[in-house]
């Protein structure tokens, strides 16, 4: 009955947007609803209930729906079945016939199935003009069940002010709809009125209720074209659809061009070559990183020596004055090349090692380029020339080893010097030091002796500081 009446009312159903992020949910719900209405496969009993001086057609009780969900979906807990029923009702597929709040109750409350024409899978985005026609039509029918609720009366007054210039047209549309409805059978009209009311309860919900039609911004970003083409519930032509005072009108969907397809192919080819890690590998890397740096996080591991501003222990200042790196500091240099570069003492130790091997020009060039980026603009050109003459010019006293491609780019950049003139050369030298010089430094006796000396001297330093504090 509901399906047939919905088809008669339809002005023209547009094809559902299969790209909608909610379409998977809608399909699952509609599969449940279809089975629920199928009498041949044991659906929910739909019946006409006799009331005082009237009949209530095509209704089911909340208890029947909950029991059907528990039986056919293997749900053991009634609370879970009620929750699932409420989620289905919130989307407008099932609705209470006497309440604007779309929820499920496990009692004798009467519910009715929504017509397929009004299903959310049709991607409705109704205009406020349609809502104004609906509310205006309700006021023309002197029936208790069609009286406006308080929030609906407020909405009607607001819409009347917003559409003051075209209210006459809206009123005429509402009158035309009322005339059409009066020609229908009384029972059919009663069902259609409730289904129409439920449709607007979904798209213009009661204040305090969740609007299930609002799109999640994260889902919208995954859409190829998140904009929808708005369509009128009552078949109002495009020229009469004015800009909504609430919603921003959508633009027509642009046709896909050859350039769009080429860009998509290029993007997909890049995705094929992209190295993707499994979540298990990512988790392992994150755990390993956390375990490696846990002793350097003062929120997790108490700092040694302690912060003198908190504990009144000046051991940290004594160590800093001695300019000898602590064991933790030396150990951290071995974590990565960046760790030793961002530590002043680490850079000094690394530079001494490179000087002993007569290969310090790479690090000095890298540090000079870093310093160039911090220079005042008026000194940049002069500093660029100095770096070029020292490291890259023919016959430079500290010539560095660059590949031909990087050297050619740098030569062009020097003609119009700036802070990032040596960016390519610096990156090449960085990779060279990371793969060669840094690895040799970690294996060198200089680093190993420094690390072992700190381990051996830790207890002696503690005893010496303790003795100084006792004597004072």
Swiss-Prot record:
A Gene Ontology term for the protein's cellular component: membrane
All copies of domain RGS, residue ranges: 336-451
A GO BP entry: negative regulation of signal transduction
Highest taxon above the source species: Eukaryota
Membrane topology value: Peripheral membrane protein
Ranges where the G protein gamma domain occurs: 261-330
Transcription regulation found in the keyword field: no
CDD domains: DEP_RGS7-like (cd04450), GGL (cd00068), RGS_RGS6 (cd08737)
Domain DEP stretches: 40-115
Tagged with keyword Chaperone: no
Keyword terms of this UniProt record: Cell membrane, Cytoplasm, Membrane, Nucleus, Signal transduction inhibitor
Domain notes: The RGS domain interacts avidly with Galpha and mediates the acceleration of Galpha-mediated GTP hydrolysis.
Protein name, per record: Regulator of G-protein signaling 6
Annotated organism of origin: Mus musculus (Mouse)
Classification of source organism: Eukaryota, Metazoa, Chordata, Craniata, Vertebrata
């Amino acid at each position: 009955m509901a399906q047939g009446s919905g088809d008669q009312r339809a002005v023209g159903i547009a094809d559902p947007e299969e790209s909608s992020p909610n379409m998977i949910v809608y399909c699952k719900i509609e599969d449940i609803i279809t089975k629920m209405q199928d009498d041949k496969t044991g659906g929910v009993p739909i019946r006409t209930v006799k009331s005082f001086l009237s009949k209530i057609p095509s209704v089911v009780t909340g208890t029947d729906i909950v029991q059907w969900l528990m039986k056919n979906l293997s749900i053991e807990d009634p609370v879970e079945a009620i929750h699932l029923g409420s989620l289905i009702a919130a989307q407008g597929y099932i609705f209470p016939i006497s309440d604007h709040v779309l929820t499920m109750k496990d009692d004798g409350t009467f519910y009715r199935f929504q017509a397929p024409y009004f299903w959310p899978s049709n991607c409705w985005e109704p205009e406020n003009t349609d809502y104004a026609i609906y509310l205006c039509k309700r006021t023309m029918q002197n029936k208790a069940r069609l009286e406006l609720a308080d929030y609906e009366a407020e909405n009607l007054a607001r819409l009347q002010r917003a559409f003051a210039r075209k209210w006459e047209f809206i009123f005429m549309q509402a009158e035309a709809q009322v005339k059409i409805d009066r020609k229908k059978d009384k029972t059919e009209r009663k069902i259609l009125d409730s289904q129409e009311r439920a449709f607007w309860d979904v798209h213009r919900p009661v204040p305090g209720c969740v609007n299930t039609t609002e799109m999640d911004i994260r889902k919208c970003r995954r859409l190829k074209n998140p904009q929808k083409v708005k369509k009128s519930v009552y078949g109002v032509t495009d020229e009469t659809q004015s800009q909504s005072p609430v919603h921003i009108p959508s633009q027509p969907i642009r046709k896909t061009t050859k350039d769009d397809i080429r860009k998509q192919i290029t993007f997909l080819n890049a995705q094929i070559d992209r190295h993707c890690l499994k979540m298990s590998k990512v988790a392992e890397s994150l755990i390993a990183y956390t375990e490696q740096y846990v002793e350097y996080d003062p929120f997790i591991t108490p700092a040694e020596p302690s912060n003198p501003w908190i504990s009144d222990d000046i051991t940290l200042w004594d160590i800093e004055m001695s300019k000898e790196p602590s064991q933790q500091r030396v150990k951290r240099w071995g974590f990565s090349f960046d760790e030793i570069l961002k530590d002043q003492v680490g850079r000094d130790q690394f530079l001494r090692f490179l000087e002993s091997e007569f290969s310090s020009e790479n690090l000095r060039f890298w540090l000079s380029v870093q310093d160039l980026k911090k220079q005042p603009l008026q000194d940049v050109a002069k500093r660029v020339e100095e770096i070029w003459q020292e490291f890259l010019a023919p016959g430079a006293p500290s010539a560095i080893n660059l590949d031909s491609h990087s050297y050619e780019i740098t030569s062009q950049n020097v003609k119009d010097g700036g802070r990032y003139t040596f960016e390519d050369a610096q990156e090449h030298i960085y990779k060279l030091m990371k793969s060669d010089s840094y690895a040799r430094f970690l294996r060198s006796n200089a680093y190993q002796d420094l690390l072992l000396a700190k381990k051996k001297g830790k207890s002696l330093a503690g005893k010496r500081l303790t003795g100084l504090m006792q004597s004072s």
